[in-house]
Amino acid sequence: MRMFILDNSHGCDTPGKRSPVWEDGSYLQEWKYCRAIVKKIAQGLKEAGIPNHILVPEDHDIPLRTRVQRANKIAAQYGISQTLLISIHLNAAQQTNTASGWEVHTSPGETKSDEYARVFWETAKDLLGDKFPMRGDWEDGNPDRDSNFAIIRDTACPAILTENLFMDSEKDCRFLMSEEGEQTIVDIHVKSIVKLWLSKI
C-alpha cells in the first residue's frame, strides 16, 4: 500500500448532519467533527511516516462526483491496487436514542476492500471494547456491510466507509465529544492504517 486517502464526510452546508441539542445545550456537527478527526489521523500517519492525502480540505460540501474524480486521480498516480480510500462518517438513526454502535461499509460483492475493512473492524472492536455494539453483517462471512454509497462504489481503488457511532444516540454522542472518545476514533483509523502499511494484505 502506497497511499491512504482520507475522506471527511459531509460539508458545512449539508442540511441535517448534526446531533440533537442535548439538555445541557451541547451538540455535535458531523462536518466539523469529522474534519477535526481526519486532521488528527493525517497527523498521526505523518508522524508514522505513512503517506496520506485529505480528499476534501474545504469546509463546504464537495459533490460526490468531484470527490470520486479526485480519488481516482490520486489512485492513478500511486497505483489503483496500492491506494485505499477511507471515508469517515458519523451514523444517525430515524429516531433519537434508538441505535448505537460502530460499522464499516464496502461496495457490494466480494472485493479486496472486504479484507481491509476487517482490519478496521478488529481494531474498532479492540478499542471500543464492551462500551458499544459492533454492528456487523456476517452473511458473506465478513463483518463489513455491503452498501451502494458512491464514494466507495465509484472509486477505482479499494475503498471503505466507517460509521463511527451514532450522533443521535446521547450515549454515543457524549462519548464522541469527550477527549477519550475523540482519541479512540482517531486511534481506530491510525492503528488500522499502520497495520495495513506493515502487512502484505
Model regions: which residues?
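Active-site-proximal helix/loop segments of hydrolytic enzymes
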Residues: R2-F4, W31-I201
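Short glycine-rich His-centered loop
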Residues: M1-Y27
